[in-house]
Amino acid sequence: ARFWMTFGQEYLTHLRVIQNIGMSRIDPIMYNGQEIVPIQFLKAVLPNPGDLGENYTGETSIGCRIRGIKDDKEMTYYIYNNCSHHAAYLETGAQGVSYTTGVPAMIGAKLFIQGVWKKPGVWNVEEFDPDPFMKELNEQGLPWHELFNIDLEL
């Protein structure tokens, strides 16, 4: 399995410029006799990300591409979810990145509170039965899809 994220060239260029001009620094610097932290200054002058959802277009795409051997045969498996920024905004007033972050966190909390995910000790969410979580994803607006034995470009 492999985790990856992709971004448009314009977005990557902006990130590179921010880094190259030192605005991603987290150490304090002196500016006009004031100590400031560049990344905190940048946050103060940029628009609040929560206010940008109305103009987002396109979709998020979150998935796992898996390749391995099963029953002595090479197999591929792709499980994924696409989420429309526009649909997420209409439902919540937030864009798809916020939606795909918040909904899974809510589901995890719900399963814990309901006692579905509860064991003595300390556990990571990945150690619990995934089936109730996957069922809830479908019911809470993040339906997932599966593709088998396709070219995954791995």
Where are these regions (language model features)?
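C-terminal catalytic/substrate-binding lobe primarily of soluble NAD(P)-dependent oxidoreductases
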Residues: 1-154
